[in-house]
Amino acid sequence: MSKPSSFHKDHLQQTRRQFVASGKHLLGGAALASLGLPNSALASNDGAVQPHFVPKAKRVIYLHMVGGPSQMDLFDHKPQMDEWYDKDLPESIRKGQRLTTMTSGQARFPIAPSKYKFSAAGECGMMMNTELLPNLAKKADEICWMRSLHTEAINHEPAITAMQTGNQVTGRPCLGSWASYGLGAMNENLPAFVVLVAIPKNREQEQAISSRLWSAGYLPGRHSGVSFRSSNDPILFINNPPGVPNAIRGRSIEGINALNRINYQAIGDPETQTRIQQYEMAFRMQASVPELTDLSSESKQTFDLYGEDAKKPGSFANSALMARRLAERGVRFVQVYHNNWDHHANVSGRMPDQCRDVDRPCYALLEDLKERGMLDDTLVIWGGEFGRTIYSQGGLTKDNYGRDHHPRCFSMWMAGGGAKGGTIYGETDDFSYNIVKDPLHIRDFHATVLHLLGFDHERLNYKHQGLDQRLTGVETAHVVEELLA
């Protein structure tokens, strides 16, 4: 008969006296939390690295447009393409670059000029799609426009993963987790990192959005994002079961955490500490989350600003308003995903829906943050995982077309939080196919965001598998000074 493992021995040898002694300080902490009183141990940043220099941004709201928005239909104006309608993309432009399997077999690569009206917005003269984004255009001088981002990934899963974690391979911490790890929490009653998944009105071709995109990877698990659902309970199982009062729930958590503390002393697994913190956070969120999600305190003026959709849980407008409320309550990093930007076909039928979803809420979010004095230290980011091709995928008419994936150039924008408003950075060729001025790799983008949060991207690291791991990886990355206010 085999002998019990040391793990089992540790548990068999625990006595009631040890249990009580080991857990007594946790009982006090949970009791304080149940009474709504602060607990200095719980309020601490618990090992946060702290900034290397004074940050310009205290928090981030990252609006990720899943699928890859078409840059030449939104922010990268190419009027000369009108003369190229239905002509083949020159090989001198393509330069043998990799294509997806969805278009690599096409006999032709016919140019599809954008059908939308562009005009200059703001004093900065940003040429953008004012037909579909009239409200966002009003903020042109407060926005830092980036038209020369590029990446290596040509398919959604690796591209989204790279955009969020700095690497196409899954299992790395995402940007929100690095922000949580570096800066810690500002509110003991809410997570440092929250994720909202908005539901688009048009759902023709949505991409999978999985929880690994807000994983902490090899960082301690407490830095993972907490996803809020758009209907019913925002977080599953956070409320007490029917018939179970707070006092009993609190005692249950006290007992569980005392056992976890004993386990930690015996085994030393740091994730046990994470589990303790998660139980405590969940208990405190029973009070904080209902208040957060109750929009009855918002004024008529606020709903007039964001639009009626802001009252509909799960809409992008509602998510934008929730992002402001989360930021206002001290959440460090709010990640909002908006799906269905993967326009392989029917751009004219889908792009207007997408822009109607985001145009007014994006304007409203920037205006709302500004009115509340929060925009200067809140960095707002908008963009996807790659761009689209100037040539049409599938059928082409002057009124409709599709576009394939294009990682060689795409557009994004930032506002607030130390980003330089009115800047137009980067330039692509006449076909929006290659970058001709100021290339901006996603590593440089990540380094710049970390800089705005107060971190040297080379010094913000975490020891894992014997290496000092970091968001920007081992390849060279630069902070782009031209993007900084």
Which residues does each PLM region occupy?
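Ligand-binding pockets and gating/stacking loops
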Residues: 1-485
